[in-house]
Amino acid sequence: FGSGTVIWGKKGTAPQNFARNNGNPFAALMSYPDVPEGIWFYNEVKYGYDNGIMTGTSDGNFGPYNALPRCQFAVILHRLAGGETVPFEQRYPDVADGMWYTDAIMWASEAGIISGYSNGYFGVADNITREEMATMMYRYARYKGYDTGARADFDQFLDGNKVNDFARKPMSWAVGCGLISGKYGQTVLDPQGQASRAETAIIIMRFMENIRPAAEVSSVSLDRDRIE
């Protein structure tokens, strides 16, 4: 193969090693059985896969319709930030040292991006809601120094008055800048509804392409997500 020939294959396999050793461009093949080409979230899932931001579950699938636990979203944001290591502190009774999500939660807590509940727990396995995700994305954008000035009026949504106070500004920003859109013909926000993994992939790609400055976008190679 010439040095300009694109080598296709799965990550971590012989084709990737060949491309690396011979200076060829490498294009990763995504092979989730539950994410066929042409499905409405395929491009976003592949974007997350290619950039090492959001990968599959332990059974080899992506789990697009599965709800996303809070600990997994902490891991995703940690990947976006480059995987900074923060010393462990016993901040939450349900976050032990040495777990696959511990570093991410320590970092996100230290950065003020994710906080626990009023009872002191983090809620590791609790499924993240749409308004919680908007809030964490908003805090992450502020942490990175990105523009968070966009705003949207909730009056266009039938349930706009159901957004909790803590999430009103973040949700207004997320809708205003196009990260989160309404459901059922743009009629409802569903703020307390659970965010699926497919929806999360879409939101992350929108953030990376439209909010995060293009010069900062880089691939991050990290371990796959896990479902506990």
Task: State what each model feature region is.
Residues 1-4, 157-163, 176:
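Ankyrin-repeat and related helical/solenoid repeat scaffolds used for protein-protein interactions
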Residues 1-30, 47, 107:
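Solvent-exposed loop and capping/linker segments of extracellular ligand-binding repeat ectodomains
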Residues 29-42, 51, 55-104, 111-131, ...:
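Feature responds to low-complexity, polar/acidic, surface-exposed segments characteristic
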Residues 49, 109-110, 175:
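Alpha-helix C-terminal capping/helix-coil junction sites
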Residues 164-176, 201:
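Alpha-helical membrane segments in multi-pass integral membrane proteins
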Residues 195-199:
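Acidic helix/loop microenvironments that form the catalytic cleft of cell-wall polysaccharide enzymes
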